[in-house]
Design a protein with these regions (language model features):
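PLD-like (HKD) phosphodiesterase/transphosphatidyltransferase domain
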Residues: 1-74
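A structural signal for short, well-ordered beta-strand segments and their strand-loop junctions
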Residues: 18-22, 69-72, 99-103, 120, ...
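Short catalytic/ligand-binding loop motif for oxyanion handling, primarily in non-cytosolic enzymes
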Residues: 27-29, 78-81, 140-142
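Short acidic (Asp/Glu) patches
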Residues: 44, 49-55, 102-107, 112-114
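HKD-type phospholipase D/PLD-like phosphodiesterase module
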Residues: 76-112
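HKD (HxKxxxxD) catalytic microenvironment of the phospholipase D
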Residues: 107-147
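Signature of lipid phosphatidyltransferase scaffolds
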Residues: 138-184
Length: 184
C-alpha cells in the first residue's frame, strides 16, 4: 500500500475507523512549525474544518453517520509532543472524532499487552481491514502494512476494545489536570 491508497481508505470506509496510538513522541515533519510555536508559547494558525482538509474530512464523514475513534495510551508526565498533540485533539474532536486517553499507569496490566499503532477500518464488519503503522525508535514513520488476515484483525479488535475500556474521554482527561504535567 502506498500513501495515496492509504489516504483513500479514509474516503472508502463504510461505518467506522479506529486509531490506536501508543508512542509518546511522533516525529512528523509537517508538525514542526506547530510544535515550534507551541514550544515558544505563540499562537498557532487556526485549524478548523474551514482551513484543514483532514478536519473537513472528519466532519463530512461524521455528519454522514460514520464514526471516528482514537485512543492514545499515554505515560506521565506527558512529553512535550503529547502536550502539543492534546491541542490538536481538541480540534479533531470539534470536527467529530471521538478521542479518548488511556493512562498506562492506571491500567498497566491491561494496556501493557497492546502492540503497535494501527488504524482499523469497519472493524466489526466482514469487510474489516487494518493498517499497521511502523515507526522507528525516534517516532519517525517508516512504513505501513495493509492487513486483512483474521488473526491480525482479531488482535486489532481486541486491542481496540481494551483501549476503549481503559480510557477516558478527552474532555475528562483534560479536566483532570494531568495534561499539563511536563518532563522538562
Amino acid at each position: 500500500v502506498n500513501f495515496v491508497e492509504f489516504d483513500a481508505y479514509f474516503d472508502r470506509f463504510a461505518t467506522d475507523v479506529f486509531r490506536l496510538e501508543n508512542l509518546q513522541n511522533y516525529a512528523v515533519d509537517a508538525e514542526d512549525a506547530g510544535l515550534k510555536a507551541f514550544r515558544e508559547g505563540t499562537a498557532r494558525p487556526e485549524r478548523s474544518v474551514r482551513t484543514e482538509p483532514w478536519l473537513a474530512r472528519i466532519a463530512v464523514t461524521t455528519v454522514a453517520g460514520k464514526i471516528w475513534q482514537r485512543v492514545h495510551v499515554v505515560d506521565h508526565p506527558l512529553t512535550e509532543y503529547l502536550r502539543y498533540e492534546m491541542e490538536s485533539y481538541v480540534e479533531s474532536q470539534a470536527a467529530g472524532e471521538r478521542i479518548r486517553i488511556a493512562d498506562r499507569a492506571a491500567a498497566e496490566s491491561a494496556l501493557s499487552g497492546l502492540g503497535e499503532d494501527f488504524w482499523l477500518f469497519d472493524g466489526d464488519s466482514p469487510k474489516a481491514y487494518a493498517v499497521l503503522m511502523h515507526y522507528d525508535n525516534a517516532g519517525h514513520f517508516v512504513g505501513f502494512d495493509h492487513a486483512v488476515e483474521p488473526a491480525i484483525l482479531d488482535r486489532c479488535r481486541h486491542e481496540r476494545d481494551v483501549a476503549l475500556r481503559h480510557s477516558m474521554g478527552l474532555n475528562t482527561y483534560l479536566a483532570s489536570g494531568k495534561a499539563v504535567a511536563t518532563t522538562e
